[in-house]
Amino acid sequence: KSVGLPELAGTKTELDGKEETSAEFKEFLRKKVFMNPIIWILAISDFFVYIVRFAILDWGPTFLQESRGLSSEMAGWTVAIFEVMGVCGMLTAGVISDKLFKGRSQRTCVFCMAGVLLFISLFVMLPETTNPTLLLAFLAISGFFIYGPQALIGVIASNQATKKAASTANGVVGFVSYISVAVSGVGFGFISDHFGWQWVFITMIVIAVLGL
């Protein structure tokens, strides 16, 4: 604990916390959550992850119709495939984090965001005559990678805040991340109207880099 590591479950330090006063608990939350820079770094990272996710969900079908000439039905499948691949990616990220990285979820998040960055970049570079199936495949693979960090960042925050403050830490991270819904909707709509779709995806790539 003296070097900033979380308390282990069942240790004397954690058990003593059961007898603490309300003021002591508030001080614990202040130190472990609200004044913990790691929690805020995680919250900001999750904010960027959610921006990319909702940008694809909200604007992906519109882009495919307006810029690539896909039918509304074909473009609509983007959302369904994106979500299914996202669930698969989330489960895979959990296994990789436990088995390959021995619980070091931060490494899994970096790996996944690098995958998002790669496939969104490749998607942007595809010519307008690209087969629609390939377009959907690239967006689906992006979904596979982006849902892993979304799930694991909450786990990392819980570990940092300890079991006693895990819910509060997740609440802070979740609150900040969901602000991205408004930013994604309004921000990318403005960019597409004034600068074109190319800049929407360039902005998305920059945000994916920040999410790393």
Where are these regions (language model features)?
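Intracellular juxtamembrane helix-capping segments at the cytosolic ends
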Residues: 147-162
